[in-house]
Amino acid sequence: MKRNISMFLQLLLIILMMISFLFTSLLVPSVSATTLNTISTCLINYKVSNFSVYPTRNHAGNSYYNLLDFSIQNLRFAACSKPKPTVIIVPESKEQLVSSVLCCRQGSYEIRVRCGGHSYEGTSSVSFDGSPFVVIDLMKLDGVSVDVDSETAWVQGGATLGQTYYAISRASNVHGFSAGSCPTVGVGGHISGGGYGFLSRKYGLAADNVVDALLVDAEGRLLDRKAMGEEIFWAIRGGGGGIWGIIYAWKIRLLKVPKTVTSFIIPRPGSKRYVSQLVHKWQLVAPKLEDEFYLSISMSSPSKGNIPIEINAQFSGFYLGTKTEAISILNEAFSELGVLEGDCKEMSWIESTLFFSELDDVANSSDVSRLKERYFENKSYFKAKSDYVKTPISVGGIMTALNVLEKEPNGHVILDPYGGAMQRISEEAIAFPHRKGNLFGIQYLVVWKEKDNNNIVKSNIGYIEWIREFYNTMAPHVSSSPRAAYVNYMDLDLGVMDDYLLPCTSTTASANHAVERARVWGEKYFLNNYDRLVKAKTKIDPLNVFRHQQGIPPLFASMQEYTYSSK
């Protein structure tokens, strides 16, 4: 009897191992040993030694998974069930970057480009079309060279915002840069999508302040602004990341900041009625404040308890000047907020970037060297959506939104003010189009942890259903025809390409269909700039080598007309 049980357990173990092996093998799209050996040999021949191959029975997997997971910021895409790259390449020079692209092309691999790994939908780390793919991770290409005399800096694509800010501050205490607040976001992708932040009402987006770039295209050419031509240079600034080539470096314009700036984060929790009245007044004030002022709101529903608070509201303010000036401006324009001197802190610009960062325990810290930290400790699962608002939302409309927000303790909504320089820059100046007429942008966010992800009562599906409900509820109150969205807050719910079109093997009709299919999300992200972006894509990447689920396809019918030329 015992022998039979033992044999049964051994058989069961073998079956489970076989199932596990079969499941794991499905995570990596089929690739022959010959093909795998080809790309490995190619990389070695080009002296690219820093790469890791998907582990097989002959290769240990720790280094591969450590490298893969290091930069995945949204844990939804680090799950075991997600497809894995065949190879992860970490180039350490522009020559190695060029060689990496050529080796991927030689092996017919899809290419995923990863700078900081903050892609909201995991497009820098995952591919879902079933083809073998490679991740080219730029983490070693993170240099920042600042030239104060010319008020410019060359920033490699793998540098983070925090590394960039820190390098600028070491060179000058009266210069800064306009980009986002999360220091671990990669510069390559952030600027490719626009890059909105605390200085944007004064100086525009990160992409508005790019004066040159170095782009590795699908043929392995390293192109500067002159070589790529003005149409491509226009497209890569705000036209989305991962679809034009690989940004080796941006040349950015340094921006003047005073030695003293003012920062504050003021909580204003309360009833839905109280918060809705504050938000209603905020939307009338924040877009019209001086260009030097940035005032945003974040809201969430508190965890259920005995405290009679329905909504947590938090106002984050930044002013290019002293706190005396900041308080005077706000008390005149927004007295309902009740800002006091004790709420505000004077600091340097670089200290303000730390103050507003998502790094732990920085509220009372002045150790700005922490901005150089690349690894983000507080990773989570999340899903996000975005909107733009052109006309003020009524108190009743805000109340309706807060009723939905109240349902989900893990839900958040962030309101970012526009106006200022964003109002004056033309929507055709670069590919990012959301300018005149926008009062503010909205980011909807739901965030959960591992314990929540495995909750039988409320799994990740429940969280995603909630944010979709929130988004649908807001439809009457936001932009329409099209309902605009911010490409850096990528949302695959807006639509995806059913297949990844390769024009060289497709008909003109199917290629044209792909362009119209992509228009569904393309016009939400890029408005009237979409067709111009299609032409730029056809010119720089006619074979659609750089692509993902929500990319911009080339127009096959015009391939001959747009055969690459910088003229």
UniProtKB/Swiss-Prot annotation:
This chain is glycosylated at: N50, N364, N378
Q: Which GO terms describe its biological process?
A: alkaloid metabolic process; nicotine biosynthetic process; response to jasmonic acid
- Provide the cofactor list for this protein: FAD
- InterPro entries membership: BBE, FAD-bd_PCMH, FAD-bd_PCMH-like_sf, FAD-bd_PCMH_sub1, FAD-bd_PCMH_sub2, Oxid_FAD_bind_N
Pathway(s) served: Alkaloid biosynthesis; nicotine biosynthesis
PTM annotation (Pros-8alpha-FAD histidine): residues: H118
| Induction summary | By jasmonic acid (MeJA).
Q: Does Disulfide bond appear among the keywords? A: yes
Q: What is this protein called?
A: Berberine bridge enzyme-like D-1
Q: Which tissues and organs express this gene's product?
A: Mostly expressed in roots at low levels.
Single GO MF annotation? oxidoreductase activity
Gene Ontology CC terms, in alphabetical order? vacuole
| Top-level lineage group | Eukaryota
Name the source organism.
Nicotiana tabacum (Common tobacco)
User: What are the protein's UniProt keywords?
Assistant: Alkaloid metabolism, Disulfide bond, FAD, Flavoprotein, Glycoprotein, Oxidoreductase, Signal, Vacuole
Q: Which PROSITE patterns match?
A: FAD_PCMH (PS51387)
Disulphide connectivity of cysteines: C42-C103
Give residue ranges for domain FAD-binding PCMH-type. 81-257
Function per UniProt: Involved in the biosynthesis of pyridine alkaloid natural products, leading mainly to the production of anabasine, anatabine, nicotine and nornicotine, effective deterrents against herbivores with antiparasitic and pesticide properties (neurotoxins); nornicotine serves as the precursor in the synthesis of the carcinogen compound N'-nitrosonornicotine (NNN). Catalyzes a late oxidation step subsequent to the pyridine ring condensation reaction in the biosynthesis of alkaloids.
According to its UniProt record, what is one Pfam family this protein matches? FAD_binding_4
Subcellular locations according to the entry: Vacuole
Q: What is its EC number?
A: 1.1.1.-
Which family is this protein grouped under?
Answer: Belongs to the oxygen-dependent FAD-linked oxidoreductase family.
Instruction: Give the signal peptide, or none.
Output: 1-33
**Record keyword Signal present:** yes
Q: List the residue ranges forming a coiled coil, or say none.
A: none
